[in-house]
Amino acid sequence: MTRKLITIVVCLLLLTGCQTAKKQPSKRSMYYWSTTFKLSTSQQHFLKTQHISRLYVRFFDVVTEPDGTLMPNATISFASPFPEKVELIPTIFITNDCMKQPGNTDLAEKILRRTLQMCETHDLPHPKEIQIDCDWTLSTRKRYYAFLAQLQQLARAKNICLSTTIRLHQLTQPAPPADKGVLMVYNTGDITRFDEAKPILNADSVASYLSRRKPAYDLQLSAAYPIFSWRVLFRGTRYVGIMHSDDELPVIAGDTIVTRQPTIDEILRAKDIVERWKASANNEVILFDLSSNNITKHNKSAYEKIFSH
């Protein structure tokens, strides 16, 4: 009888442990993608009420000059203090053209040094992690991976973790040399097509990508989902460009401006698909991005759904 009782207690403890594990909340994070760090009242409120614990802040881009030189561009300035109790992850965007340039063996050292100098200059906390964002391709993979391996070694010497973005199409390649990755679950379609209603996020496209990829991807992943929209100008059915402001592009009679924006339901569908493919990817949910327009489109419960669904 005692043995049976012990067995029952052990089973109950195991069951409780499994249920507890399933209920662990996801880490909540946001991207901040602007040239000026200045938090509005609505942004501060969003960070607080949505319990955001990490901010991936774009520090600068690395671009190619006409002579092939790699240069920093669009460096962020800080007009607001960084929020307390929120972890800062400096993020650097590198254009794929940079990876086409031979040489530049000191790029990793330059990026790390500049990032740490910016943190010191703006009285920001020493980062525990930095992230590199690059839309690398098969032709630039070898050079990009060599750069990451060098940066990872330099970062580890300063107790800094290295993460890198992973686009869906990049899952076909071996995992890059980094400590972790962020799977970008967006930009699944062609923005230039008039008949493409869901170019930012189509859950069916996500399912198609992931159904052909083994979940045993050799890198710890987080998942990033889109809450942004695009206003796209078409002349007939011909793509003209994205309207970042009303007067950015000339609009003539007969033109059409369409808004492409993922619905909350589409985001939740995509999140479910990622969950079935690799559940641990949703242990950290990141939204792109923390612009005031993006965080005021829906009511509070809609964003809560994305984080807690």
Regions found by a protein language model. Name each.
Residues 228, 236-309:
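Substrate-binding cleft of secreted/luminal carbohydrate-active enzymes
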Residues 55, 132, 181, 223, ...:
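Conserved, mostly hydrophobic/aromatic
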